[in-house]
């Protein structure tokens, strides 16, 4: 890798700022100051900028407890984005692995590993995603029995060509439910409850496949995934 590119990969320097840093003699490779941006940096090269050793950070994998009112998009818009909550270099390279809408909280995965992201979200895997929902109206008795059966059979939502895959509906109280789905249609859980004449007040994602949101993460906090968590997908 070229030295100027390596500087951009491991710092917040742009290509032009990296070349200026080189010109000022701020960078050394294997103990020798170099001003040549085309110098090759190998795996064993020791690169220092202003006396600080630079190391490539490689691929990154995070989980976040997404708060209310935050978007999973990486582009600045009306709402704050998940990337604005992350204090890492080159944060713009991260992307959300499956999104939550701005009104939904809970588990969001982020990475700069496109292949891993595809393994997590591929429809072929049918990975279960578990949500907690609070409803606007109580759901109980015969209406609950009917809803459980309807969710389990699959539903043809407005605007869709195929019905949803079988989903599990578990009542925690007349207004609070745990829902497990294995597909990822747009606003699917909200639309499923709307189809049976109810409305979701709050929606929170607990898990994706085997990965459960860390209970120690406060809304807006994130942490790196452990090796076994990454390998689970």
For each predicted feature, which ranges?
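Basic, flexible Lys/Arg- and Gly-enriched helix-loop patches that mediate nucleic-acid binding at interfaces
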Residues: 1-233
């Amino acid at each position: 890798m070229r030295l100027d590119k390596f500087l951009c990969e491991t710092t917040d320097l742009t290509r032009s700022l990296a070349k200026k840093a080189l010109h000022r003699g701020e960078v050394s490779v294997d103990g020798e100051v170099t001003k040549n941006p085309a110098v090759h940096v190998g795996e064993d090269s020791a690169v220092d900028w202003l006396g600080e050793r630079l190391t490539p950070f490689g691929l990154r994998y995070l989980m976040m407890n997404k708060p209310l009112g935050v978007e999973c998009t990486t582009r600045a818009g009306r709402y704050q984005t998940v990337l604005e909550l992350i204090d890492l270099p080159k944060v713009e390279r991260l992307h959300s692995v499956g999104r939550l809408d701005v009104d939904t909280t809970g588990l969001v995965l982020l990475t700069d590993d496109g292949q891993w992201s595809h393994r997590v979200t591929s429809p072929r895997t049918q990975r279960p995603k578990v949500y907690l929902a609070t409803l606007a109206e109580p759901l109980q008795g015969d209406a609950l029995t009917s809803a459980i059966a309807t969710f389990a059979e699959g539903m043809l939502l407005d605007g869709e060509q195929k019905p949803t895959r079988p989903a599990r509906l578990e009542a925690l109280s007349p207004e609070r439910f745990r829902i497990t789905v294995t597909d990822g249609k747009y606003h699917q859980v909200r639309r499923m409850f709307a189809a049976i004449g109810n409305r979701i007040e709050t929606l929170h994602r607990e898990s994706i496949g085997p990965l459960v949101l860390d209970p120690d993460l406060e809304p807006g906090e994130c942490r790196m995934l452990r090796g076994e968590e990454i390998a689970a997908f």
